[in-house]
Design a protein with these regions (language model features):
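Conserved catalytic-core segment of nucleotide-activated headgroup transferases in glycan assembly
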Residues: 151-153, 159-207, 211-219
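Donor nucleotide-sugar binding/catalytic pocket of nucleotide-sugar-dependent glycosyltransferases
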Residues: 118-132, 137-155
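Membrane-proximal helix-turn-helix segments that form the acceptor-binding/catalytic region
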Residues: 48-56, 81-82, 100-120
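A charged, aromatic-enriched C-terminal amphipathic alpha-helix characteristic of glycosyltransferases
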Residues: 281, 301-330
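Nucleotide-sugar-dependent
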Residues: 231-248, 257-268
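Conserved acidic donor-binding segment of nucleotide-sugar-dependent glycosyltransferases
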Residues: 270-284, 291-298
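Short acidic/histidine- and often glycine-rich active-site loop of Leloir-type glycosyltransferases
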Residues: 203-204, 261-273, 277-278
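A short, histidine- and acid-enriched strand-loop-helix "catalytic/donor-clamping" loop
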Residues: 86-103
Length: 338
């Protein structure tokens, strides 16, 4: 391989830059690991490869969630000692604060890496406000890159949208499924289907809840045929999550129900009772909303929310996300030239 000048370790199909530089998508080059030992070996190899590339590269877009050992962030720490370094953008899901020790260690790593990082591209306006203070880096380096729905037109149009008598929820990270199980216990007359691996082996699943682990296309079908889609998010986090689930639900014209109190990002996409419903995150709040959606008296309002969901979600495309990310990269390049 010739020495690439523009390297992307995030799984993004970024376009060429104004200068004509074509991105080298390195995401597929780094293998996934099946155990912690493999993960450590792969991370060391990845970090070393990134440092070798950094010696001749002009632009690098790094993955903030590159693995438990964070090789991309570690590479930035060592890049401080290069005589000449590339423009670096740190992208993707960023970091949650976590417990006291975890937070202190993560903050130390970020601050050590920060001199090598020109921009942090976060996924919500709320993160953009708190990120700099949270991690001890300059606010001028932080930009919001609002996320996108992920189902393709082919996947969305692969079957008829239906309402088959169940409430759907899915996804793995940052979900409060304990709350959802309690909601199901409070509403025994409603059926719930939850597609996740995080509840595997649980013995306390209510009779009206079906737990499934399904391939991608079956996940889409379950969402397509649900009465509504609930995304119960863990509150108090320092990064946004769940966007794929509730935006994909909106593409199907589903009522998308998400808790918004102490949760970042939700209001970037959803206006409550306009194109979705934002709850306060309490047990009663979720139960009341579910019954409101099912109430025949409210079907005209429900229909309007569904229509607006399908209409407003159109702006949150993958192409828009790539354009925003590219503009962030171009901004840094222009600054470096000046």
């Amino acid at each position: 391989m010739n020495e690439p000048k523009y390297i992307v370790t995030v799984d993004l199909d970024l376009p060429p830059l104004k200068s004509g530089l074509e991105p080298y998508c390195a995401f597929a080059q780094f293998p996934s690991a099946s155990n912690l030992k493999e993960e450590f070996i792969n991370s060391v190899q990845r970090m070393w490869t990134l440092l070798k590339w950094a010696r001749h590269c002009e632009v690098m877009v790094f993955d903030s969630v590159s693995g438990p050992f964070q090789p991309d962030l570690l590479a930035c720490i060592f890049m401080r000692f290069l005589s000449k370094r590339p423009v670096v953008i740190m992208a993707d899901d960023m970091w949650n604060k976590g417990g006291t020790l975890k937070y202190a260690f993560q903050k130390m790593m970020v601050r050590l890496a920060d001199p090598s990082i020109d921009r942090y591209a976060v996924h919500s306006l709320g993160e953009e406000k708190i990120f700099a203070q949270l991690w001890g880096i300059p606010h001028k380096k932080v930009r919001a890159c609002i996320y996108n729905y992920t189902f393709t037109d082919e996947e969305v149009n692969a079957g008829a949208v239906a309402t088959n008598g169940y409430i759907f929820s899915g996804g793995n990270p940052s979900r409060n499924y304990d709350l959802l199980l309690e909601i199901a216990r409070q509403l025994p007359h409603r059926k719930f289907v939850i597609a996740t691996r995080t509840l595997r082996g649980r013995k306390d699943i209510p009779a009206n809840v079906e737990i499934v682990q399904v391939p991608h296309l079956e996940f889409i079908r379950l969402m397509r045929e649900a009465d509504m889609v609930i995304t119960p998010l863990v509150s108090g986090g320092t990064k946004s999550s769940g966007q794929q689930t509730y935006l994909n639900a909106m593409r199907f014209g589903k009522i998308s129900i998400v808790n918004g109190k102490d949760v970042l990002g939700v209001t970037d996409y959803i206006q409550s009772y306009v194109n979705g419903i934002i709850t306060d995150g309490t047990l009663k709040g979720f139960c009341d909303v579910i019954e409101w959606v099912y109430d025949p008296v409210n079907q005209e309002a429900v229909h309007k929310i569904k229509e607006l969901a399908q209409e407003t979600v159109k702006e949150f495309t993958y192409e828009r996300y790539l354009r925003t990310m590219t503009s962030i990269i171009e901004e840094v390049i222009a600054e470096s030239r000046n």
